[in-house]
Amino acid sequence: GNGIEKGAYGLPWYVNDGPTYWNTELMQKCGLDPNKIPTTWDEYFAAGDTIVQNCKDVYLGTTMGYNTEDLMTAGVKSFMNDDHSKYTFNDEAGVKQISRFVELYKKGGIPPEALDSSWSQAADLFQRGNLVSMAGSAYSADGFKQNAPDLYKNLAVGPRISNDGKSASVAYEMLGISANSKHPDVAIDFARFVTNEKNQIEFDKKASVFPSAKGGSG
């Protein structure tokens, strides 16, 4: 399990990785080489500039740099000081990274929706052909295949953008029990049932995610 402050406790359920999806048809249209998928932040922002120069109403993506991963992979080393009394991500690397997103947004390489877009809105824009790239999940491809078959035919999958060469990005989901639960024993039994190795694997196969249970990768 995973302990949290003040005695809260959660049972690990599944983990997910986040690749970057690219619309190769739009890449060609906007002057990019589909055989050279951007992998670093310099390459990513250079692609954005190329899109702005060659296409109208087409954008690089909705990523705005506010995720911790977008800062850490650009060189930010820490987010808080040792006693957790002050944020520290406004260092040189953090300011540079956020500034690059702001500049690309002002140029028109990032859509207005990016300021308050949800995950589903980003997928909608990508499926409609307004975005050249999208930071997605392993299961996103199934949605593209079902909802946007033309996009799926022109889909390329690249690593998460990173300056450190570490493209894997594992996000995990847990099941926890509310302290105010009227039936905590039943809730705990249910959480254990859902997260046991057998049921994790069955769920993960259908959802295109990865098990957290020991031995589940087999």
Regions found by a protein language model. Give the residues of each.
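Short glycine- and hydrophobic/aromatic-rich loop-to-beta-strand nucleating segment
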Residues: 18-22, 175-177
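Short helix-initiation/N-cap motifs at beta->coil->alpha
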Residues: 39-45, 112-127
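Hinge/lid segment of periplasmic solute-binding proteins
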Residues: 1-17, 93, 152-156
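Glycine-centered hinge/linker elements that transmit conformational signals in sensory
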Residues: 45-50, 86-115
